[in-house]
């Protein structure tokens, strides 16, 4: 944006999409594409009704700050995945968390997404790398 912080009324020369950046940051593009596909395929991430959100969304306790952990429970919004745990760790160090006990299939970790799974984690204790997201289900 050439240093323009509020480009709302700026011309196309400021607001045009620089498509070269897509190739330069192919890993980020693939990550966002995977997140979008995950949202499209799983109704738990598309609850459009406040009552559904209240019924299925549960924030899990965390020690300290800069970490958000929530659970989408009971096949939220008709999803095939029974329980989904989503963690956003903004800390500069790994976060050690307590989640409901069980065997989880990891679908998002370390900047990669694979709906078929990137591995397995076992609760109740999990460690999430610094400045990253983790999505897993059981």
Range-by-range predicted roles:
Residues 24, 112-114, 133-134:
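A short acidic, often aromatic-flanked loop/helix-cap motif at beta-alpha or helix-coil junctions
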Residues 28, 105-107, 124:
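A broadly tuned, weak detector of single residues within folded domains
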Residues 45-48, 113-117:
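Acidic Ser/Thr/Pro-rich low-complexity disordered segments
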Residues 85-88, 106-107, 135-137:
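Conserved active-site loop/cleft motifs that coordinate metal ions or position small ligands
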Residues 100-114:
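Solvent-exposed beta-hairpin/edge-strand motifs
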Residues 118-138:
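C-terminal beta-strand-rich structural cap/linker in extracellular carbohydrate-active enzymes
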